[in-house]
Structures are given as C-alpha cells and as structure tokens.
C-alpha cells in the first residue's frame, strides 16, 4: 500500500509539472521586432529560366520557382501562356530569409537583370507574357518597389515600362522548366547568349563586378 501511495504522488507531481510547462508556453510571446523565418517575392523579367538562375546566386535566397502570374485563367500551361492568350507573365517566385537578404537587395538584383525600357518583351522574347513586372506582397513591398522604380527612372531618359502590381495567384510551371539552367546547362547558355541578354544588360547597367 505504501508503494502505491508514492506512485500516486509521483503521477500527481508529473501532471502538475506538465500543466505548469503548458501554461508557461501559452503565456510566452515572440519578441517584438523579430523577422519571419522566410518571406516571398515575385518578379517577372522575361524568360523565367534566366530570372531563376540570376536569383539562385543571391545569398539568403532559400528557393526559386518558375511559374505564371497575372493572367485570367487558372492553372495555365506553358503552351497556353507562350501563345499569349492568357494574360499571364512568366515569373519567378522567390522564398528568401529576410535576416540574410533584404527585399531592397532583391529589387536591386531584379532591376540589374532586366531591360526596364522594353515594353511587352525582354531581349529576344516578344509578347506580353515576357513583360517585366514586380508583383508585390503587402504594402511594405509595394512602397519599396515604387521607391526603387523612382530611382531607376532618374537613371534613364526613356520611360520605365516595368509594372508594379499586387501579386495574385501564382501557378508553378511544368517540372522541366524548374532549374532549367542546371538540368540543361549547354542549351541554357546557348539560349542566353543568342538572346543577347547579357550584352544588353551590360549596355544598360555596365559590367557586373
């Protein structure tokens, strides 16, 4: 009987400790001003193969996904988008760590890897599916995007054609488009060179460091 009594006391003490720990956990709150572990940015800059490759080089970028955004239909295919009838733009959705890279830095990378003077095209690719645009997630991104565009406008005499619009549904592109530059490095380099992308970027922004 005495052994059973101690067992009951032990069980009761264990339950009390669990309740105390649970209450402490519920009362805890995250520190004010802490940043989220990840955030999302979405950019359209012509061929998503190239945009994805450019952002994959940036420290603090967690992942990139090629896809379609800004159109009128759900779940578009590459063939539908490339024909120009859906209103979607080829784009890249970027998941990044705000503690390692700021949204301002991503905007800077974006501008320096597009032709902001081109309307409804980028480099050798023509059509509104290749338009350049910043798709913002929230008012903070919108404000930063507009400030960055204003700075770019001061650099060029011609009007800036890059749109700034709220992000809508993003549809992941077919799997063979994901990390295309990794899966098909020779074809990717051939396309990028013959499209004149880097030559035009150097003309606009100067040589990269």
Regions found by a protein language model. Name each.
Residues 2-6, 15-209:
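Flexible coil/turn and secondary-structure edge motifs
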Residues 8-10:
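Small-residue packing motifs within transmembrane alpha-helices
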């Amino acid at each position: 009987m005495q052994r059973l009594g101690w067992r009951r006391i032990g069980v009761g003490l264990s339950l009390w400790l669990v309740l105390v720990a649970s209450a402490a956990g519920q009362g805890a709150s995250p520190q004010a001003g802490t940043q989220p572990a990840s955030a999302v940015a979405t950019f359209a800059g012509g061929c998503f193969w190239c945009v994805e490759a450019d952002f994959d080089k940036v420290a603090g970028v967690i992942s990139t996904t090629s896809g379609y955004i800004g159109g009128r239909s759900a779940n578009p295919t590459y063939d539908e988008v490339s024909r120009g009838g859906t209103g979607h733009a080829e784009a890249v959705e970027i998941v990044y760590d705000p503690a390692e890279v700021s949204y301002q830095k991503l905007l800077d990378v974006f501008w320096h890897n597009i032709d902001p003077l081109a309307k409804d095209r980028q480099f050798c690719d023509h059509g509104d599916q290749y338009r350049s645009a910043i798709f913002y997630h929230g008012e903070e991104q919108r404000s930063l995007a507009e400030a960055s565009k204003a700075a770019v406008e001061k650099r060029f005499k011609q009007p800036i054609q890059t749109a700034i619009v709220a992000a809508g549904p993003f549809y992941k592109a077919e799997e063979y488009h994901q990390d295309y530059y990794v899966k098909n490095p020779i074809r990717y380099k051939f396309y990028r060179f013959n499209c004149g992308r880097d030559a035009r970027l150097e003309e606009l922004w100067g040589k990269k460091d």
